[in-house]
């Protein structure tokens, strides 16, 4: 089977939006229009038609990725394949957005014409910057009262620091929103309501918009001309740029992440989505426009894979879902090569060969089984047993390990126990499945109490996972009070910390002796072990045991038994015994030395700090700020919400003080405020707070020995 669509005609895009910006409607309309053009294009070939279009107008993608085909609004483009990757709008699921950004080539940011740029929009924008994802912006809901396209343009420039370049301006607004002016063609596009926007016509620009259209067109052409010397020279010499030249200039600068083309419409009123699809094709990159993906081979040497079918197979698993009909579905993005169903691939991070049982392609609400996938494709595999989100799948003969996704450490934990004996076994299976799907969710058993502990990114995150356990797996569970994930670290350097483990009791004894140096590391650097032994005073074969001894001790700090982070440990000296020394003795000696060193190196307790944003009516601003301050919060700024919608308060607050915040915010503001919260960083807990925590843990390490 050969490729149906060349890789240059692929677009792997995400549609991301704040919760209320109308992402679902926009996506539904995309499926509606692409389905119709697909059907129109295929009927004469006698191919199967997609008759679900007539039966169902309300298609919502439950799938993580869906494939659509587009031949342009006027049917004048060669057929393009658009893979749409779903991205959630809620900030507690930043992790979901993060993993979809990792596999996108381009994004369409949807904004509400009234609300404009909102807190979650900023989070998504930052992640798109992190992965260098080119984007276009679609200002939706232009039929709403208070709609203002140009205000959203200013917000993208001022708040998000994006160079937003309108390539359309609206014709009318609110109830009188009729269509758009296409600034490239300099024509008005008016959609036909009777055909649900399938038909449209080009008209002359209304006279009252002519001057405004010319002004914005001039700005757009200037941005396009900066793409290369030839265009710039032509522009500066006063020669007009052709339609193709404008588009190629805008495309080059969008793909280079220098500008963000802006469009507008109303998905609900069937206006503008069709032109947005044309913009996806005109301005967003194909997999072939994106640089080769970098990875490492088994010896950790840097290698790359180009987006071509004749390269060895490489893919990234970006989402795992449990499907009631087929079991575990693994969604993956193919970066290079070809793979057929039935082929064996290697998961190098698990050192495990897996057979791809079946490969499925999602089309809106139906799935098609396909025999093979090519570079640039996004599909789902059935039959892969052991895999975690972010793992690489590769050709076993040409191994590459793609850059792992970075997942934040959980900041909150809860004990969870099954209600009945029957739930016990089901709960274990359910929790493991959920942890496989979501790497920011962890499950462990507490060694002392035997309880099952679940950890995640926030109260809401854990609530939803417990709810899914009940809904999808039928497990009833009781949940304990949330616990904060504190950490411990050191603030000063200590040298000559000695640890000696000696046992001579007849027969073969034990002997291990080490001298360590402990130093604080900058935040986020983690644990580092350095071997500085000279002259073989500690034999080479025992050095990994020293590292292991320290690593094991890191799990239990000396203040309150919390994990230790950001410490550099150097093995500087030691001694050994020809007969009695062994790995275990050096492991024990290292553990003793590290504990002693921690006590001497000014240990401190760290607590997770959250970035909190509260949207509140103006009357309650004082109450909200006072309440945040009483929670040891630092208010970092306040600004007006666009469209006279009250105030946005930004603050940094310790997670420990935020439990039950949604309830108290409701009572403070008569239920009229909303908030979002995401993990920011760890910070040293004030002395009084640390003392209380240490006391509550029964002086932690002392109690644990």
Curated annotation (Swiss-Prot):
A GO CC term assigned to this protein in UniProt: cytoplasm
Pfam name, any one: EFG_III
Principal localisation: cytoplasm
Keywords of this entry: Cytoplasm, Elongation factor, GTP-binding, Nucleotide-binding, Protein biosynthesis
Domain named tr-type G: residues: 8-288
Molecular function terms, GO-annotated: GTP binding; GTPase activity; guanosine tetraphosphate binding; translation elongation factor activity
Record-level GO BP terms: ribosome disassembly
Keyword GTP-binding: yes
Binding site for GTP: 17-24, 86-90, 140-143
Protein location: Cytoplasm
NCBIfam families, A to Z: EF-G, PRK12740.1-3, PRK12740.1-5, small_GTP
Task of the protein: Catalyzes the GTP-dependent ribosomal translocation step during translation elongation. During this step, the ribosome changes from the pre-translocational (PRE) to the post-translocational (POST) state as the newly formed A-site-bound peptidyl-tRNA and P-site-bound deacylated tRNA move to the P and E sites, respectively. Catalyzes the coordinated movement of the two tRNA molecules, the mRNA and conformational changes in the ribosome.
Entry's family note: Belongs to the TRAFAC class translation factor GTPase superfamily. Classic translation factor GTPase family. EF-G/EF-2 subfamily.
Descriptive protein name: Elongation factor G 2
Species the sequence originates in: Bordetella parapertussis (strain 12822 / ATCC BAA-587 / NCTC 13253)
């Amino acid at each position: 089977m050969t490729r149906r669509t060349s890789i240059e005609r692929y677009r792997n895009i995400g549609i991301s939006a704040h919760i209320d910006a109308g992402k679902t409607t926009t996506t539904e309309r995309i499926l509606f229009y692409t389905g119709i053009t697909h059907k129109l294009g295929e009927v004469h070939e006698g191919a199967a038609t997609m008759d679900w279009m007539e039966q169902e107008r309300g298609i919502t993608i439950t799938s993580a990725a869906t494939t659509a085909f587009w031949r342009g609004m006027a049917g004048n483009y060669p057929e393009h394949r658009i893979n749409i990757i779903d991205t959630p709008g809620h900030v507690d699921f930043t992790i979901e957005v993060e993993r979809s950004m990792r596999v996108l080539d381009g994004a369409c940011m949807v904004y509400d014409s009234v609300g404009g740029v909102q807190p979650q929009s900023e989070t998504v924008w930052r992640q798109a910057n992190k992965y260098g994802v080119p984007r276009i912006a679609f200002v939706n809901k232009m039929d709403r009262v208070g709609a203002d396209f140009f205000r959203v343009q200013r917000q993208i420039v001022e708040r998000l620091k994006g160079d937003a370049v309108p390539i359309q301006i609206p014709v009318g607004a609110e109830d009188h929103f009729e269509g758009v002016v296409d600034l490239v063609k300099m024509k008005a596009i008016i959609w036909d309501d009777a055909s649900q926007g399938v038909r449209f016509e080009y008209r002359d620009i209304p006279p009252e918009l002519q001057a405004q259209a010319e002004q914005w067109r001039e700005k757009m052409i200037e941005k396009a001309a900066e793409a290369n010397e030839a265009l710039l020279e032509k522009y500066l010499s006063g020669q007009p740029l052709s339609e193709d030249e404008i588009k190629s200039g805008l495309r080059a600068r969008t793909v280079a992440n220098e500008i963000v083309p802006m469009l507008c419409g109303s998905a609900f009123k069937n206006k503008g989505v069709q032109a947005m699809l044309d913009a996806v094709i005109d301005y967003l990159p194909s997999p072939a426009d994106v640089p080769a993906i970098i990875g490492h081979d088994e010896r950790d040497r840097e290698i790359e894979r180009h987006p071509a079918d004749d390269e060895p197979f490489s893919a990234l698993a970006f989402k795992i879902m449990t499907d009631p009909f087929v079991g575990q579905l693994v969604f993956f993005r193919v970066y290079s090569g070809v793979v057929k169903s039935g082929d064996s691939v290697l998961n190098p991070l698990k050192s495990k060969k897996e057979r791809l049982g079946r490969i499925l392609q999602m089309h809106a609400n139906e799935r098609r089984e396909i025999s093979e996938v090519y570079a640039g494709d996004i599909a789902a595999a059935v039959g892969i047993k052991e895999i975690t989100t972010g793992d690489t799948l590769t050709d076993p003969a040409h191994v590459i390990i793609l850059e792992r996704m970075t997942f934040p450490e959980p900041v909150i934990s809860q004990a969870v126990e099954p209600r009945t004996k029957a739930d016990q076994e089901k709960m274990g299976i359910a929790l493991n499945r959920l942890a496989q799907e979501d790497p920011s969710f962890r499950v462990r058993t507490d060694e002392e109490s035997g309880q099952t502990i679940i950890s995640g990114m926030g109260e809401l995150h854990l609530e939803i996972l417990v709810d899914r356990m009940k809904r999808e797996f039928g497990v009833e569970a009781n949940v304990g009070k949330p616990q904060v994930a504190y950490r411990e670290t050191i603030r000063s350097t200590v040298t000559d910390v000695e640890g000696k483990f000696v046992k001579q009791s007849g027969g073969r004894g034990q002997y291990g002796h080490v001298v360590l140096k402990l130093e604080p590391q900058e935040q986020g650097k983690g644990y580092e072990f350095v071997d500085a032994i000279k002259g073989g005073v500690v034999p080479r074969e025992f050095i990994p045991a020293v590292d292991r001894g320290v690593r094991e001790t890191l799990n239990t700090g000396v203040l309150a038994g919390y994990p230790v982070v950001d410490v550099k440990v150097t093995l500087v000296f030691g001694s050994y015994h020809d007969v009695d020394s062994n790995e275990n003795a050096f492991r024990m000696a290292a553990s003793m030395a590290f504990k002693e060193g921690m006590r001497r190196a000014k240990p401190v307790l760290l607590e997770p700090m959250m970035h909190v944003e509260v949207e509140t009516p103006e009357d309650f601003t004082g109450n909200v700020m006072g309440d945040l301050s009483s929670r040891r919060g630092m208010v970092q700024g306040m600004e007006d919400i666009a469209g006279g919608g009250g105030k946005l308060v930004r603050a940094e607050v310790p997670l420990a003080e935020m439990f039950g915040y949604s309830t108290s915010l409701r009572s403070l503001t008569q239920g009229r405020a909303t908030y979002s919260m995401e993990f920011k960083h760890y910070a040293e807990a004030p002395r009084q707070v640390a003392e209380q925590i240490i006391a509550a843990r029964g002086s932690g390490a002392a109690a644990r020995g």
